[in-house]
Amino acid sequence: MSTNLRKTHPLAKIINNSFIDLPSPSNISAWWNFGSLLGTCLILQTITGIFLAMHYSPDISLAFSSVAHITRDVQYGWLIRNMHANGASLFFMCIYLHIGRGIYYGSYLYKETWNTGTTLLLLTMATAFVGYVLPWGQMSFWGATVITNLLSAIPYIGNTLVQWIWGGFSVDNATLTRFFTFHFLLPFTIMGLSMMHLLFLHETGSNNPTGLNSNTDKIPFHPYFSYKDLLGLILMLALLLTLTLFSPNLLGDPDNFTPANPLSTPPHIKPEWYFLFAYAILRSIPNKLGGVLALLLSILVLFLMPALHTSKQRTTQFRPLTQILFWSLIANLLVLTWIGGQPVENPFIIIGQMASILYFSILLILMPIAGVIENKMLS
């Protein structure tokens, strides 16, 4: 009797061990669907992105009109562009839910997987930022100007660094060209790192809702979880297509329908919705350098999660105190997202400052303390 090819062929064996015969915990819930959804998002974004790049011109005199040309004259160009723009929103929605699941169920204790994942988040944010500049609308231009300008807060080398990134003394043609280059390059870096992320995950196996060792109760990934993931995939694609076909500009900024004009500043400069929480933290500190550091720390705090875990239990499933803090953190992030989109005036300033303090307090102080208290209550 000959052995199954998928178990012997060098290439097929890798795929088999990663997606077919992979031993998976029998009790993982729908919260474990997001990894495959993110992979799908990445593939979808790459395909639509490549088709857009075929018709796009990274030049300040042509960029805006080339995007208009794509939506008007290219076969299904409107669909490709809207799927790419809204696909990014869906990508971040899945990322945030994936990270939230990781925090709730203590998945961050797989340090290598968690650290590669956090690095993936940073790379995805960088990709989304440079991509937002490409249509060369008002918000693209001013977003690029404001965010790159933050680097000038770095002592001594700040101004030189900003000019080096701009490729001149202002956001200009050189900036657009290099941003297009990075936007094309980074997704492939993300793909490579995603494979590393999976490699590290398969070294330990998946976590599960109980946080206990599940080696005694594993089932093959296919057909059980491949079909379960397929349901999540259909729901995600339904959401993406609904957004793309019925309300494609819902999450965009109206200012981006105006070509970039260095002589006119939009009344409210704000990023896409998925960056608003970090933008609110940045704005809540009156000092420029302090704001930049807080902005960085708001994401980099994820790297500290394994070190801040004080509880004897892995998941939050059986820890009521930490659960309250976790959901307070989620509510707080929603408040920050709302504040990020509001003008800099009272009462929004003080709400933003309070929410920023609470964000760091929950993650760095209250959650570790709650873990210690819960340990005491158990003993």
From Swiss-Prot:
Topology class, membrane: Multi-pass membrane protein
Binding site for heme b b566: H98, H197
Gene3D superfamilies for the chain: Cytochrome Bc1 Complex, Chain C
PROSITE patterns: CYTB_CTER (PS51003), CYTB_NTER (PS51002)
GO cellular component terms listed in the entry, alphabetical order: mitochondrial inner membrane; respiratory chain complex III
Top-level taxonomic group: Eukaryota
GO molecular function terms noted in the UniProt entry: metal ion binding; ubiquinol-cytochrome-c reductase activity
Record keywords, A-Z: Electron transport, Heme, Iron, Membrane, Metal-binding, Mitochondrion, Mitochondrion inner membrane, Respiratory chain, Transmembrane, Transmembrane helix, Transport, Ubiquinone
TM segment ranges: 34-54, 78-99, 114-134, 179-199, 227-247, 289-309, 321-341, 348-368
UniProt key word Transmembrane helix: yes
Cofactor (UniProt): heme b
Binding site for a ubiquinone: H202
GO biological process: mitochondrial electron transport, ubiquinol to cytochrome c
Cofactor binding note of this UniProt entry: Binds 2 heme b groups non-covalently.
Main location: mitochondrion
InterPro entries: Cyt_b/b6_C, Cyt_b/b6_C_sf, Cyt_b/b6_N, Cytb/b6-like_sf, Cytochrome_b, Cytochrome_b_C_euk/bac, Cytochrome_b_N_euk/bac, Di-haem_cyt_TM
Further comment found in the protein's record: Heme 1 (or BL or b562) is low-potential and absorbs at about 562 nm, and heme 2 (or BH or b566) is high-potential and absorbs at about 566 nm.
Subunit annotation: The cytochrome bc1 complex contains 3 respiratory subunits (MT-CYB, CYC1 and UQCRFS1), 2 core proteins (UQCRC1 and UQCRC2) and probably 6 low-molecular weight proteins.
Protein's name in the database: Cytochrome b
Organism of derivation: Terrapene ornata
Gene transcribed to yield this protein: MT-CYB
